[in-house]
Amino acid sequence: MDDQLRQSALDFHQFPVPGKIQVSPTKPLATQRDLALAYSPGVAAPCLEIEKDPLAAYKYTARGNLVAVISNGTAVLGLGNIGALAGKPVMEGKGVLFKKFAGIDVFDIEVDELDPDKFINVVAALEPTFGGINLEDIKAPECFYIEQKLRERMNIPVFHDDQHGTAIISTAAILNGLRVVEKNLSDVRMVVSGAGAAAIACMNLLVALGMQKHNIVVCDSKGVIYKDREPNMAETKAAYAVEDDGKRTLDDVIDGADIFLGCSGPKVLTPEMVKKMARAPMILALANPEPEILPPLAKSVREDAIICTGRSDYPNQVNNVLCFPFIFRGALDVGATAINEEMKLAAVHAIAELAHAEQSEVVASAYGDQDLSFGPDYIIPKPFDPRLIVKIAPAVAKAAMDSGVATRPIEDFDAYVDKLTEFVYKTNLFMKPIFSQARADAKRVVLAEGEEARVLHATQELITLGLAKPILIGRPSVIEMRIQKLGLQIKAGVDFEIVNNESDPRFKEYWSEYYAIMKRRGITQEQAQKAVISNTTVIGAIMVHRGEADALICGTVGDYHEHFSVVQEIFGYRDGVHTAGAMNALLLPSGNTFIADTYVNDDPTPEQLAEITVMAAETVRRFGIEPKVALLSHSNFGSSKSAAACKMRQTLELVRERAPELMIDGEMHGDAALVESIRNERMPDSPLKGSANVLIMPNVEAARISYNLLRVSSSEGVTVGPVLMGVAKPVHVLTPIASVRRIVNMVALAVVEAQTQPL
């Protein structure tokens, strides 16, 4: 580690507060009543319920989502036996990973005890606190004994990640690697360097899946492990001891090996050894920070080799974060009493299968130009793949149920998967009613920027979820090339249609129709022809206008108002409406908030604001939410006579005439809109109850400023929109920062709007 990295790491751990974790309350503690419920006397009620039924602890406490990361510091991350206290930063780091990737809370516990039996007694006594135990950085062979005894004594999952996490990921990699080179697990020969916890667990798991034990040769620091090599050999080693054939070194046994599994130290495997391996060898060089052989060195003598390491700077990283958060997620969610072989194997297969799936846009963004299509350089998923939790946790949970170790079986697996998806995509629950309705009658949606990577990823999602029938505008050769480069599994003409923006036989009809619409607005025939050829939003809008598509999504490239101008000119406003407006939804920890008008009208009149307010309320109801509207101003219920304040008061009168059933009040300050007690101090008889969820701003400046401040200030907040309201056809103009998920969400909303369009 160089000095700069060392200092950066020290600063990272020290500032702004020491360490990486904290405890945050999940219940309010703002009033005397809150304290009475959280502690004495109210806390007695759940205590008595748990006394009657111990399983009630999962209902009334955090036990069901709490894991202990426990270590004695005897084998810390390549640092060796540095002691329990010195290992604490690692254990805190493990806790951060549990929380980040699976939403699991962690207490890190460092036990200053080297005697295995005493250590076991300490850990076993902690069972009432936790839903699971993650043993970490405990040296072999004691780790095997400790885990086995704790599994026997405890009625919650006990999992030594250094063993089983590495084994699960390595096994998934080997299964996929053998698939790439067309070899069978039962036929291949494997040489192993290292006989510690990870190596033994890897071999055990591979044998459980069908690798033949007689095809495995293990080398430790003394050389080949053969029968009767030494008296009192550890049972874990003896299980893999081979007959003595005179071979003593790694170099002696590597000849013809299909797989090298390294869980030992740097530079153990030489290029000369790699040369002697079988056709298309697999090399898992997992020592950290320096592997048994560096991939470029191995590739220099064997281009056909498939190589995995524990490092992030090479392809095929064997990283335990691919496994442990999600195997615990599945185990906790069914109240598993153990993590058994069936659950581990389920995780292996789920991880292996995910590598065959199309590329995730999150992974593509994180790893730049790397080719992440299944093949020699991509046989296991990347740690940042958001689908890991959705694939692995349900597989593990189901295996726990099928093998009889689940105390709280999941009754509705579809609902469970939806819940896990919400962890990945925070908009999932919010969009659920829209998605359900869109799936019922998928419509043709034209995406104007069809060559964009985000649009292509969104198209994959739309097909996978069954939300729409996409039509992409773009050059077919470019679209096909980018689909292949992005590792997507969609096909033009099968999953979606392409409209070639450079040459389409319908273009003469398109520009003629566009000219007919625009000829009295200063557009010549020549300009109409040029617009159709050069502007994909014009093409998409004309397609919807002609009935060749049901809805349009545009704006992922370019200026919002340029796109809006096109759709407004071609479609006009819907019946009974004389303006358009844009609304953004913010999904915040405190609740969902809708803000309008965020894009269209710079300084709307009272009449325009009234129309926007009514349309906003209609749109909010599509999400299954009852709108509570506040008209915002610097004025609070008549405190100012300014023109801006009067505008909002006039808006209130107009809205009450047009939508008397709508819960609305104003004009008011922002804090009064969100906090009922503040509002009641000024207007105790306000018809607006609770916190307002629809905020109508006096102008676009106030709307955009408020939206962006809320969006950025809440690190956990996510957005949906902008939702375009008032245009005669289902169309939404997005912005260049739109994510793949935002595109998917807006397509689904456009489909639902198209379903209700008059024929």
List each model region and its residues:
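Glycine-rich adenosine-cofactor-binding loop
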Residues: 66-78, 83, 167-171, 181-207
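Anion-binding alpha/beta catalytic cores of soluble intermediary-metabolism enzymes, centered on
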Residues: 85, 137-184, 407-410, 417-759
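A short, aliphatic-rich alpha-helical micro-motif
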Residues: 127, 185, 253-254, 274-277, ...
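Adenosine-phosphate binding glycine-rich loop
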Residues: 161-162, 178-184, 285-393, 400-403, ...
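NAD(P)-binding Rossmann-fold cofactor-contacting core
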Residues: 193, 209-237
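Rossmann-like adenosine-cofactor binding region
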Residues: 237-306, 311-313
